[in-house]
Amino acid sequence: MNALQAEIIAALKTQPTIDPAKEIRRSVDFMKAYLKKNTFLKSYVLGISGGQDSTLVGALTEKAMQEMRAETGDESYQFIAVRLPYGEQADESDAMAAIEFMAADQVKRVNIKGSVDAMVQSLAETGVTVSDFNKGNIKARVRMIAQYGIAGENSGAVLGTDHSAESITGFYTKFGDGGADLVPIFRLNKRQGKAMLAELGAPKHLYEKVPTADLEEDRPALPDELALGVTYDQIDDYLEGRQVSEEAATKIENWHKKTAHKRHLPITIYDTFWQ
């Protein structure tokens, strides 16, 4: 392990192995503790894509809210799952299967197409032609705006799905899906998230599907690994302190350097200023 690898692992808090049940408990307790300390909060809001990460955070959140209601007798504690399609989503069935699995207290659907297209048109009227890639980032940021709109009307906080395998590469939109109040699975890599979903009894197809941000229309359902040029297994091995090929290590470290500006992290399980 080189010095940079050790530094990255320490910063992202990744462990070489985990006990899935203990990490489930840890994330749930983190979310509950934040609610107990901030008694004006009554809901958590999370965008649901139908992929592994939002399915995991959603399942953990519903567990936390069920326990909060049982422990306090306050039925106003609610988990609000939000579908945020741009028009029609190709894998809508996966998103609905994820919501059914996590048994969210409330489900809202906000079609972001009108807002995104209006912004693109407004920019065009000023002479700015938005690229397909940039439009994808606008989609992510509109989704963030919608979630905060819902949270603001429901005494809520917005949850993010950032984890260490995503954070190391900066594979998220700054002030888009990177915009959140709490990130309950920060410290985990991709395979550890899979292990936690297996422990929770999630349908396999929700965490074995090919990961994709699916933001670009010119390249629909572009696999994360193709966009990054490195596999999640290689990223996970790197984060667990294992040896990876020189080519993979270079790509991972280049992504880490290039996206350093994105890692001004929201509140994690390791922050103590709010306690």
From Swiss-Prot:
Mg(2+) binds at D53, E166. Its EC number is 6.3.1.5. Pathway: Cofactor biosynthesis; NAD(+) biosynthesis; NAD(+) from deamido-NAD(+) (ammonia route): step 1/1. It catalyses: deamido-NAD(+) + NH4(+) + ATP = AMP + diphosphate + NAD(+) + H(+). Deamido-NAD(+) binds at R141, K174, D181, H261, K262. InterPro entries: NAD/GMP_synthase, NAD_synthase, NH(3)-dep_NAD(+)_synth, Rossmann-like_a/b/a_fold. It is an enzyme of class 6 (ligase). Pfam families: NAD_synthase. ATP binds at G47, I48, S49, G50, G51, Q52, D53, S54, T161, K190, T212. Keywords: ATP-binding, Ligase, Magnesium, Metal-binding, NAD, Nucleotide-binding. GO terms for biological process: NAD biosynthetic process. GO terms for molecular function: ATP binding; glutaminase activity; metal ion binding; NAD+ synthase (glutamine-hydrolyzing) activity; NAD+ synthase activity. One of its GO terms (cellular component) is cytoplasm. SUPFAM superfamilies: Adenine nucleotide alpha hydrolases-like. Catalyzes the ATP-dependent amidation of deamido-NAD to form NAD. Uses ammonia as a nitrogen source. Homodimer. NCBIfam families: nadE, PRK00768.1. Belongs to the NAD synthetase family. This is NH(3)-dependent NAD(+) synthetase.
